[in-house]
Amino acid sequence: MPYRTRWFCVAVVVCLSAISASSYAQTAPGAAPNSDATYQQLRNIGLSAEAVTVNNFELKRDAATFLLRSGTVCFVAPVQGRVTGAVFVGDGNMTLDPPSPGEAVSLKRLTKEDKFSEDFSRLALRFTDSTYDQIKKGGTPASGGCDAGLLEDSQHTTRKKLNYNLSARILQDLLNAQQGGLFVAFVHGKHYDDKLMYFMDPDGAPGVAPEQVELTSYGENKSGTWASFNFSSEYRDGLGAGGEPNSRIHIEHQELDTTIEKSAHLTGKAITTFVSESSGLRVVGLSLFPTLRVDSVKAEDGQPVSFIQEDKNDDPDFYVILAKPLSKGDKFTITTTYNGKDAVLNEGSGNYYPIAREDWYPSKGGGLGDYTNFDMTFRIPKGMKMAATGSLLSESNDGSQNVTVWRSDIAQPLAGFQFGRMKEEDAKLTSPDFLVAAYANEEPPDWADKLRGGTMGNLSTVSMMKQPLSEAQYAIGLYTGYFGPLPFKRLNITQQTACTYGQSWPGLVWLPICSFYDVTVRHQLGLDFSDNIYWKVVTPHEVAHQWWGQTVGFESYRDQWMSEGFADFSASLFLQSAYGKNGQKEFLNFWDEERKSLTERNADGFRAIDVGPVTMGYRSSNSKTGNIGSHLIYPKGAYILHMVRMMLWDRQDGDQNFKELMQDFVKTYGGRAATTEDFKAMVEKHMNAQMKSFGDGTMDWFFNEYVYGTALPSYRFETASFDTDANGDVVFNVKLTQSGVDNNFRMLVPIYIELASGNIYFLGRARLVGNSSFEQKIPLKGLKDKPHRAIVNYYDDVLASSN
């Protein structure tokens, strides 16, 4: 489920907040965008005459320490009586000691040094905390002499490179009665990188929110996050895994009225009701696609509300400025009108491609953790069909427009749509009671239309939509049995013009157009992927996201492995079940490909299994490791759940224990975001006696190895022979060795035998700790014929090297 990104790899989380109650409405006449006087002062800020000389001055900001050995600090001009920035020229040093052990290891791996220590001679700072007072107190008055270009360079970086409106973020704190906690350092280093940024924000650092601290580089050819974590105090207080809540608002309801013309130009009106989750809130940040330009923002009484939205090519973050602050728990409603192109593309012949998936309306942004109720009206050209999230309440024609009205059955993390000149075919399920509707465009898009003729045929997908319809229908029934029922009763399976990826929103799936084509056409298009499994699993994977990502959200990029990994795992269930007698072969082939994805080196020479734990998410991708993130999150997340399934499986009840675990997880966390630790607690609730005794009553051993670690054991039979005892029963002589791990690594390793008939029989699980061996003579009572062979890890029960 890909996300549009800015300078980081997870969806942007600019802290939001909003309003309700006409008593707080803007009283001044409507103003042009970005016209707020205080904001303009921040936007055009420069250095003042105030400066101090510092010697061996230490400024500690959470895990970072800035030592200004000698030099001059010049401050920016005050705004609203507060100084929000400074530049330093001289001799300085920055050290970083992450409070998270995993981040400390990752930083050492990245720098190839035990300690992060960066010297610098130039430094720019922006802040809303006590930095000004501390530096002023620790220095002696000076006459200036700083480089004004340092401040200008930091402004250019945030606006042009990172597309992040730092001035608006500072305004949030300036208009709050309480002192802020924002601190941003632009470090021109001499050793690692001359373009480092240390970002500390109680609301969440933009690239890694809700985590508050981030060290990142932003050079042209060297970019990516070096380290990120919560405040050090949260780890000391036992909150480091999940962190303290730091959202400014919760959006309670969205009423969206959207018109999309034949040209794909979008015009929208959003009535957004939100609840303040902080006190003193005046500036609310919202996520809106950059090319959708805001025309106006109004309060409930119709009075205009001031707003910020810079040029689409710069830092176009959308902020609303309230006339008066909100208290925690206050509701506020705003109406935003906006329009623009490029949020939706006209791909020709009645095909449309929504580019803006999560920000085609003013939203909270930040992924799949906040759940909102939606009422939506869509107006599209007459003769076209609309498929959207939620339930269809009505459809009518109004002049030249097709008008549909939709409502979410429950609160959902996102809303979305697909439309065009489409055909629809439905399939009704009785168990569960569910409707699957498939949509295919009547004509191919322009890019495909140019390929018509010859061996390619006409590339029409209408006749081919029965397959994704039947796959989705089967997957819904299968997954309901494993994970429990969905909270809604309809799923729209649509075709998108993108060829090689799918995506899933609540009740709505976008499938790649090329998944509708057969093998011959895909070969002609050069889409012979090495594993070829992709085309078999793209539909069941995206359907599985109705549970993983939509019904159960994820708290942050640290937890996204559950969404993508669980969906990938679900696809393996589909292969095993839906392919009949070939299911076992497809299932084993799937896990073989997942392991290869983790253990084969990419073009940059890295293996996904080695670059970091799965909780690093897309942060594992950077200019050094390449685009390796998806090769970690999808297969590693899938393997983790697969291993849990196999540990819970037993001869008598099969998957029953696993089903109870997953259904409990969905029931407990449906309609909200879950964390990795939430899932761990759920596994511990349902673990069997063997798992419990092996881990002293917890699953720490397993999660430390595979979720928070990068372990990859190897297994080898030193001995695997069969004798017979005096009664003629087979005796299995086994010595199984575990290697390639540390001394604390432990695993329950499954052993199987293949009988002479070819049937596979599960013997049991060997308990292995560290680099050691399990050696035993096992009588197989009642078995007279010697088995063909013994097999370790037959179903890829344990993620291990292939030997």
Where do the protein language model's features map onto the residues?
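Amphipathic alpha-helical substructures
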Residues: 278, 487, 630-734
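N-terminal, polar/Ser/Thr-rich
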Residues: 26-267, 295, 366-368, 700-705
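Zinc-dependent metallopeptidase catalytic helix centered on the HExxH motif
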Residues: 352, 369-370, 375, 473, ...
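Acidic/His/Gly-enriched intrinsically disordered linker/tail segments
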Residues: 564, 568-643, 647, 669-670
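Beta-strand-rich binding/interaction modules
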Residues: 279-284, 290-301, 387-388, 696, ...
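Solvent-exposed beta-strand/loop surfaces of large extracellular or lumenal domains
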Residues: 63-67, 73-77, 81-124, 130, ...
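Glycine/proline-rich low-complexity spacer/linker segments in large multi-domain proteins
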Residues: 241-245, 328, 337-378, 430, ...
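Hydrophobic helix-coil surface modules that form long, contiguous segments used
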Residues: 233-238, 242-271, 275-282, 287-290, ...
